[in-house]
A protein has these predicted regions:
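Solvent-exposed soluble domains appended to multi-pass membrane proteins
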Residues: 1-158
Length: 158
């Protein structure tokens, strides 16, 4: 139909090129993650998004800045579980922040993290690769930040 239409006949030569779908390998997404996780805005909902971007980027220093801003803006609200999971993990990985007085959920954070560690140590002793461990632990821990941190690599949101 296009070839028969007088108006479209004029542009048909412009369509003679190799049509290849391409991408930027996530560079645009990484730019946006970095931009938003470093943005300053006093709006609580905006600040929560900066914390989410810091979680996705797995940047520990950036996480702590955003975490404390979030805690200050939501002082009377319970801390969401994934934020507690990240704070507990990062506090144990790097001793730059004292987490000893943070009110972590005893069962959902402390107990579950102990189970996560036991499972990962057991699978490591069995000689599993990181990929195999991730798959084995996904049913029980796939909904945790810990699982995301250790087993999700090269994540793209699209």
């Amino acid at each position: 139909l296009i070839a028969q239409n007088e108006e479209f006949k004029l542009i048909l030569p412009l369509r003679k090129f190799k049509d290849v779908l391409d991408g930027d390998e996530g560079l645009c997404e990484m730019y946006l993650l970095n931009y938003f996780s470093n943005s300053q805005n006093p709006e609580p909902m905006f600040q929560e998004q900066t914390l989410v971007y810091a979680l996705v980027s797995k940047d520990i220093d950036r996480f702590w800045k955003r975490f404390f801003q979030y805690a200050t803006l939501h002082i009377k609200e319970p801390m969401p579980i994934h934020y507690q999971e990240a704070a507990f993990l990062y506090g144990n990985l790097e001793k730059t922040v004292d987490i000893s007085k943070m009110p972590f959920d005893r069962d959902r954070i402390l107990g579950r993290f102990a189970n996560f560690q036991r499972a990962s140590q057991m699978y490591a002793r069995e000689g599993m690769s990181v990929e195999q461990m991730g798959e084995a632990m996904r049913p029980e821990f796939g909904d945790t930040f810990w699982w995301f941190y250790f087993f999700c690599k090269g994540v793209k949101s699209y």
